[in-house]
UniProtKB/Swiss-Prot annotation:
This is Ribosomal RNA small subunit methyltransferase A. Specifically dimethylates two adjacent adenosines (A1518 and A1519) in the loop of a conserved hairpin near the 3'-end of 16S rRNA in the 30S particle. May play a critical role in biogenesis of 30S subunits. One of its GO terms (cellular component) is cytosol. S-adenosyl-L-methionine binds at residues 21, 23, 48, 69, 94, 120. It is an enzyme of class 2 (transferase). InterPro entries: KsgA/Erm, rRNA_Ade_diMease-like_C, rRNA_Ade_Mease_Trfase_CS, rRNA_Ade_methylase_Trfase_N, rRNA_adenine_dimethylase, SAM-dependent_MTases_sf. Keywords: Cytoplasm, Methyltransferase, RNA-binding, rRNA processing, S-adenosyl-L-methionine, Transferase. Its EC number is 2.1.1.182. GO terms for molecular function: 16S rRNA (adenine(1518)-N(6)/adenine(1519)-N(6))-dimethyltransferase activity; RNA binding. The keyword Transferase applies. The gene is rsmA. It is found in: Cytoplasm. The keyword Cytoplasm applies. Belongs to the class I-like SAM-binding methyltransferase superfamily. rRNA adenine N(6)-methyltransferase family. RsmA subfamily. It comes from Actinobacillus pleuropneumoniae serotype 7 (strain AP76).
Length: 289
């Protein structure tokens, strides 16, 4: 086994069930921290600090930093880190189940202030974790995440492209999305089998296309993109009649990727006002996109 693919880094063995790949390329680390641009006095939260590749250089620039770490061994290492321990608040918990709203509200943020979230996210939880965080968009200033490059392409996609999908719409509904930099597998130990990229998500201060209930935005995008090869006349036939779609200015021959976020918001708001008599999807919409 080559050193690059070794699962052991700085004395810690990467755990597959936690999706651990440890960042070690100093140039990449410098570029990510520069993009985050942490300042003293800001509320900074890192998800999945791991062995501290981002934690250490960020903590050099600030006095306080909160981290959420599920791996008990890594949390213990951070508690005994000679430089970090007095600066860190360590939350040893699964970020997917953590009540971020309760924590954010405990910070007593001032008007216009928000939490700055960042992390090298385990790729096996990155999408559901972002969906979890979108629920607290009103309390977040920005987010910087290392993700699979393919996921970043989907986050940043425009209509009429193959990458455009439900993830695109839900992310851009809540946030302005900007790619920051691409990262090769060699920047990690063990090296992942895919390319990575860093993305910046900045929650809109005012939602550009607000919906009355985000459930219906989830609902209509799930149904449309689960059948993305079908025309919308057919894909959405259990939710809308052809006449209703036309009244909402939807081309019956369009496909899911042809509609804008504004189009989907219009459909979602119509469904809120005119819900189907039977909605057998209510319990099965999830975040597997």
């Amino acid at each position: 086994m080559s050193n690059q693919n070794s699962k052991k880094h700085l004395g810690h063995t990467a755990r597959k069930r936690f999706g651990q790949n440890f960042l070690h390329d100093m140039n990449v680390i410098h570029n990510i921290v520069s993009a985050i641009n942490p300042k003293n006095g800001q509320f900074l939260l890192e998800i999945g600090p791991g062995l501290g590749a981002l934690t250490e250089p960020v903590a050099e620039q600030v006095d306080k930093l909160t981290v959420v770490e599920l791996d008990r061994d890594l949390a213990e290492r951070l508690r005994h880190h000679p430089f970090l321990n007095h600066k860190l608040t360590i939350i040893e918990q699964d970020a997917l189940r953590f009540n971020f709203r309760e924590y954010f509200e405990s910070l007593e943020l001032r008007e216009g202030e928000g939490v700055r979230v960042f992390g090298n996210l385990p790729y096996n939880i990155s999408t559901p974790l972002m969906f979890h965080l979108f629920k607290f968009h009103d309390l977040i200033q920005d987010m910087h995440f290392m993700l699979q490059k393919e996921v970043v392409k989907r986050l940043c996609a425009a209509p009429n492209s193959k990458a455009y999908g439900r993830l695109t719409i839900m992310a851009q509904y809540y946030c302005q999305v900007m790619p920051v930099l691409e990262v090769p597998p060699t920047a990690f130990k063990p090296a992942p089998k895919v390319d990575s990229a860093v993305v910046r998500l900045m929650p809109h201060k005012v939602l550009p296309h607000p919906v009355k209930d985000v459930y219906w935005l989830n609902r209509v995008t799930t149904q449309a993109f689960n059948q993305r090869r079908k025309t919308l006349r057919n894909a959405l036939s259990t939710l809308f009649s052809p006449e209703q779609l036309e009244a909402l200015s939807i081309d019956l021959n369009a496909r899911a990727e042809n509609l804008s976020i504004a189009d989907y918001a219009r459909l979602a708001n119509w469904l809120y006002d005119n819900p189907p008599a039977v909605d057998n999807q209510k319990e099965i919409i999830d975040e597997d996109i």
